[in-house]
């Protein structure tokens, strides 16, 4: 059976004339949509207007996508410097989640400022949705046969008790590979379940920071298995370095805010405005 693929998945879902619609885009859209509905329930419980998230999600998704591409291009600049026409060809692949998080975060904070919303409250509301969307989105990598780990044997994959369609689609160019997409997807969904259940016990802003911490811990270890990492040097993977920084920053902010401000419990506040400094 080794080397025989019975259920190889075509990355293209269907064609509309000359346009190929890929499973990757469909799955990303599904992840965003499900995340929106999850966040919408939390939004209503918090006493915010039901349309509050529309602009936040639109601009965060738009600028997050752009930033994810820019981030990838920066760390692959030698290639794109010689092939500048490839920069806009996003359908050839090449986006980075950390870049998307940075762009989406900046856009979200700006929208909160314009709409007079509390960014800590909004961050807590959307954090579980973000990690859920990430967990779903990793299946887009599976459909594209990308973002996999290093070589393994078929026997190793069978020992994980994986469905055959996953094992067979991890056979790429004559070799089986670690299904790192699955490892991260499971980690992210577990994070979603945890965050949804502990959010009401956390102080304002902490759900978002714990999301960054949880995601970064998983990403750090899973990244070490991947073969397509963006590299800062020959030994330093960009995603692992960024993950360490996010863990340290997030934990530090949780501790600092508890000592300095002692914020209220997330579950004990209604709709909050943009935070202002009190003048004594």
Curated annotation (Swiss-Prot):
Pathway as given in its UniProt record: Protein modification; lipoprotein biosynthesis (diacylglyceryl transfer)
Protein residues bound to a 1,2-diacyl-sn-glycero-3-phospho-(1'-sn-glycerol): 138
Protein's membrane topology: Multi-pass membrane protein
PROSITE patterns xrefs: LGT
EC number: 2.5.1.145
Molecular-function GO term, any one: phosphatidylglycerol-prolipoprotein diacylglyceryl transferase activity
Any one of the GO CC terms: plasma membrane
Pfam family, one: LGT
Domain of life: Bacteria
TM segment ranges: 19-39, 56-76, 90-110, 204-224, 236-256
Annotated compartments: Cell membrane
Gene Ontology biological-process entries: lipoprotein biosynthetic process
UniProt keywords, alphabetically: Cell membrane, Membrane, Transferase, Transmembrane, Transmembrane helix
Main location: membrane
Family: Belongs to the Lgt family.
Role noted for this protein: Catalyzes the transfer of the diacylglyceryl group from phosphatidylglycerol to the sulfhydryl group of the N-terminal cysteine of a prolipoprotein, the first step in the formation of mature lipoproteins.
Protein name in UniProt: Phosphatidylglycerol--prolipoprotein diacylglyceryl transferase
Organism whose genome encodes this protein: Staphylococcus aureus (strain MRSA252)
Lineage: Bacteria, Bacillati, Bacillota, Bacilli, Bacillales
């Amino acid at each position: 059976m080794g080397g025989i693929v019975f259920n190889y998945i075509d990355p293209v879902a269907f064609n509309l004339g000359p346009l190929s619609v890929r499973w990757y885009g469909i799955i990303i859209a599904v992840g965003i949509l499900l995340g929106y509905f999850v966040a919408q329930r939390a939004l209503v419980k918090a006493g915010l207007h039901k349309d509050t998230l529309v602009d936040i999600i639109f601009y965060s998704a738009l600028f997050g996508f752009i930033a994810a591409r820019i981030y990838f291009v920066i760390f692959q600049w030698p290639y794109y410097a010689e092939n500048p026409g490839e920069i806009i060809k996003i359908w050839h692949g090449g986006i980075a989640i950390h870049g998307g998080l940075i762009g989406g975060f900046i856009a979200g904070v700006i929208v909160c400022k314009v709409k007079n919303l509390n960014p800590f409250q909004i961050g807590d509301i959307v954090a579980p949705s973000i990690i859920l969307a990430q967990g779903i989105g990793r299946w887009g990598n599976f459909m594209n046969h990308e973002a996999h780990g290093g070589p393994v044997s078929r026997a190793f994959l069978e020992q994980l008790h994986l469905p055959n369609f996953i094992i067979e689609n991890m056979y790429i160019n004559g070799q089986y590979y670690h299904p790192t997409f699955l490892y991260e997807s499971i980690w992210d969904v577990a994070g979603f379940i945890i965050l949804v259940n502990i959010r009401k016990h956390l102080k304002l802003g902490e759900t978002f920071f714990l999301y960054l911490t949880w995601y970064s811990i998983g990403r750090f270890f899973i990244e070490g298995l991947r073969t397509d990492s963006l590299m800062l040097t020959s030994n330093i993977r960009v995603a692992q370095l960024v993950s360490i920084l996010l863990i340290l920053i997030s934990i530090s902010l949780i501790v600092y805010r508890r000592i300095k401000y002692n914020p209220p419990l997330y579950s004990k506040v209604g709709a909050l405005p943009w935070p202002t400094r009190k003048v004594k």
